[in-house]
């Protein structure tokens, strides 16, 4: 699509140029979504460490059963 060719109302070229530049700026300002407390919604490292912790706790509990 050629940007220099005016559209029906003559403003499409300017609108397209402005839209492209705004789109570039919006892509740079994207931030990861976070929950209400500021932590990421999906903290996979936290899930991993909690799994390891509970795995060790269950292992020790079963190991030391009389």
Swiss-Prot record:
Where does the record place the modification N-acetylmethionine?
1
Going by the entry's taxonomy, the superkingdom of the source organism is recorded as Eukaryota
Provide GO CC annotations from the record.
endoplasmic reticulum membrane
Keywords from UniProt, A to Z, are: Acetylation, Endoplasmic reticulum, Membrane, Transmembrane, Transmembrane helix
Which coarse location class applies to the principal site listed for this UniProt protein?
endoplasmic reticulum
Q: Does the keyword Endoplasmic reticulum apply?
A: yes
Q: How does it sit in the membrane?
A: Single-pass membrane protein
- Annotated membrane-spanning segments are 45-65
Identify the stretch(es) annotated as Disordered. Answer: 1-38
Query: Which InterPro entries does the entry mention?
Result: ALN
Composition bias, kind Basic and acidic residues: at what positions? 9-20
Q: Where found?
A: Endoplasmic reticulum membrane
Function summary: Inhibits the activity of the calcium ATPases ATP2A2/SERCA2 and ATP2A3/SERCA3 by decreasing their apparent affinity for Ca(2+).
Subunit info here reads:
Homooligomer. Can also form heterooligomers with other sarcoplasmic/endoplasmic reticulum calcium ATPase (SERCA) regulators ERLN, PLN, SLN and STRIT1/DWORF. Monomer. Interacts as a monomer with ATP2A2/SERCA2; the interaction results in inhibition of ATP2A2 Ca(2+) affinity.
Q: What is this protein called?
A: Sarcoplasmic/endoplasmic reticulum calcium ATPase regulator ARLN
Q: Which gene encodes it?
A: ARLN
């Amino acid at each position: 699509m050629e940007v220099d060719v005016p559209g029906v109302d003559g403003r499409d070229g300017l609108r397209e140029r402005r839209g492209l530049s705004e789109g570039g700026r919006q892509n740079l300002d994207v931030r990861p979504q976070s929950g209400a407390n500021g932590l990421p919604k999906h903290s996979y490292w936290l899930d991993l460490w909690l799994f390891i912790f509970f795995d060790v706790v269950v292992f020790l509990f079963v190991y030391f059963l009389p």
